[in-house]
């Protein structure tokens, strides 16, 4: 008599390849927080100089490697502090799900910083060595976000640091290395991107409220509660779009920048997703919509600038 194996007819879950594991470690849905500011700062520079493509690429990949390193430090230190489990949502999961050694994650983070430094040397040699100081401070903040005795991620200031460092600063450095200057227009253009990068961080913290409470964190989302944090997220989206209206009305930017309003469905989707759900797993779509808001907003802002440049 033939015996039927338990679970026969069910498809066994496929084991992820090392490439897939490493890709998830980078937290790819967050990487637009680096790409968008660099693109925007470079497009704005076109109004003043002929853009150096190699400098643009060096800046882009340097910023990406810094962000990847920050995400890896996050993975390492959250595990070390006992915050990550196999059931945790939104993590790379290389340690708790795939058995990768914590030491390997730390080595990958340091290697990512090493690549960023090499690219930074080229950027500084082509522009200004003062940027080396800014870069080192940025990398220190990336490490201290989850490392050190009082990680930034454990405080209410995570959104502020990420918004300024990965939003405004990335835009301004990208503009500076092409033009050798920072002006009021570049500062004003960088503000909505800073707000939206901070919003990505806020959306992560909204999802992680309960887990972060257990880990002793005091994030802005925890202090405000789910409803208050979602209200702040919605207000952040609104301010970013209103800021563009202000730039156009005051003559600081072309009316073509109104093209950013084509991205409005994404923040609406994000806010609805957070309002309707409080379970971490059910907030993934809302989180992705928040990241996509930054992506689409930044791309459309760049397109608006490009159209006004060529007209």
Curated annotation (Swiss-Prot):
- Its name, as the record gives it, is 1,4-dihydroxy-2-naphthoate octaprenyltransferase
**Principal localisation:** membrane
Any one GO CC term of this protein is: plasma membrane
Report the top EC class in one word.
transferase
Q: Which Pfam families match?
A: UbiA (PF01040)
Q: Which reaction does it catalyse?
A: an all-trans-polyprenyl diphosphate + 1,4-dihydroxy-2-naphthoate + H(+) = a 2-demethylmenaquinol + CO2 + diphosphate
Q: Which gene encodes it?
A: menA
Q: In which pathway does it act?
A: Quinol/quinone metabolism; menaquinone biosynthesis; menaquinol from 1,4-dihydroxy-2-naphthoate: step 1/2
Entry-linked HAMAP family: MenA_1
Q: How does it sit in the membrane?
A: Multi-pass membrane protein
The UniProt keywords, alphabetically, are: Cell membrane, Membrane, Menaquinone biosynthesis, Transferase, Transmembrane, Transmembrane helix
Q: Please list the GO terms describing molecular function.
A: 1,4-dihydroxy-2-naphthoate polyprenyltransferase activity; prenyltransferase activity
- Stretches of the chain forming a coiled coil according to its record: none
Q: What is its EC number?
A: 2.5.1.74
């Amino acid at each position: 008599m033939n015996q039927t194996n338990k679970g026969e007819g069910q498809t066994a879950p496929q084991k992820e390849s090392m490439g897939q594991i490493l890709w998830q470690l980078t937290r790819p849905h967050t990487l637009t927080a680096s790409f968008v500011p660099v693109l925007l700062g470079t497009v704005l520079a076109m109004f003043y100089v002929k853009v150096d493509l190699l400098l643009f690429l060096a800046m882009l990949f340097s910023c990406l490697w810094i962000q990847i390193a920050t995400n890896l430090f996050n993975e390492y230190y959250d595990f070390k502090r006992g915050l990550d489990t196999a059931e945790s949502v939104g993590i790379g999961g290389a340690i708790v799900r795939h058995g990768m050694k914590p030491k390997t994650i730390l080595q990958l983070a340091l290697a990512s910083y090493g690549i960023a430094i090499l690219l930074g040397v080229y950027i500084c040699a082509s522009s200004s060595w003062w940027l080396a100081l800014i870069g080192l401070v940025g990398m220190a903040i990336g490490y201290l976000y989850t490392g050190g005795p009082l990680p930034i991620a454990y405080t209410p200031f995570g959104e502020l640091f990420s918004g300024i460092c990965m939003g405004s600063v990335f835009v301004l450095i990208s503009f500076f290395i092409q033009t050798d200057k920072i002006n009021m227009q570049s500062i004003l253009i960088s503000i909505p991107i800073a707000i939206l990068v901070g919003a990505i961080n806020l959306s992560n913290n909204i999802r992680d409220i309960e887990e972060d409470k257990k880990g002793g964190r005091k994030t802005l989302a925890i202090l405000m509660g789910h409803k208050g944090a979602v209200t702040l997220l919605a207000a952040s989206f609104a301010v970013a779009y209103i800021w563009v209206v202000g730039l156009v009305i005051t003559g600081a930017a072309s009316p073509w920048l109104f093209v950013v309003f084509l991205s409005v469905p994404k923040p609406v989707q994000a806010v609805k997703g957070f309002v309707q759900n409080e379970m971490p797993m059910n907030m993934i779509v809302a989180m992705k919509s928040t990241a996509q808001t930054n992506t689409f907003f930044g791309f459309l802002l760049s397109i608006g600038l490009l159209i006004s440049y060529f007209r």
